[in-house]
Structure formats: structure tokens, C-alpha cells
Amino acid sequence: MENTHAVHNGIFNYLNEIKISPLSRAYTFSDSVYEVIPFYNFNIIAFDEHITRLDKSCNSLSFKADIEKIAMEIKQLIKKSNLKNGYVYYQISRGIDPIRSHMFDANIQIETFGYVVEHAFK
């Protein structure tokens, strides 16, 4: 875990260094979307399809996500890991509330989080 590459709100770090707020709507309400994106022999599998689905999921929940920036983050995460085979788990939540509430501010800033792990495909 200490050498697992991760990104949180655009800041790259190791997974054990990432700090997620307990008031994240991903944590309190599961108010988030995610995608698991595999790569094999340094090639991302069906990347455009994964990004399109992630974008559609964000739009369906009215998340204001910069999908181009997110796509670049995912590619950077894979590159930083220097892994040949693995997958990226990438999650986008509505954001962090000042206090837990079912109602949310329409202008809340989304929260992004992802990490990459090695996986032996068989």
C-alpha cells in the first residue's frame, strides 16, 4: 500500500498518504460514480469506452466533472506506476459537505480519487 500510486483532487501521492474527508458524500451517501480501467502490457483496454461511460455517469448525476482532465489524470497515474499490467480504480463524488445533509449545494466542488494496482491477468 505504501508504494501504491494514487491521486486525490489532482494531487498525486502514494495511497497511504491520501486523506479523504469523513464528510465526503462518497463516504456518507455513496454519492459517487466509479470506473475500473484495466491495462495490459502497458496498453489501456477500452479507454475511450471507460471515459465515455464515466462521463455519462457524471452527467446523469449532474456532477460538474472535467472529463478531459480526469482522462489525463488516469493516464498519468498509470505512467507514474510504471506497471506493465494492472488496473485503475477511479471515483468521482459530488464533493465534501460542510455538514452531513441529504440536501447539497448545487455548486459543490466534486471530489476525485483514484489509485493504480498491479494485476496478473490470466
Each language-model region and where it sits:
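Conserved alpha/beta cores of soluble small-molecule-handling proteins
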Residues: 1-122
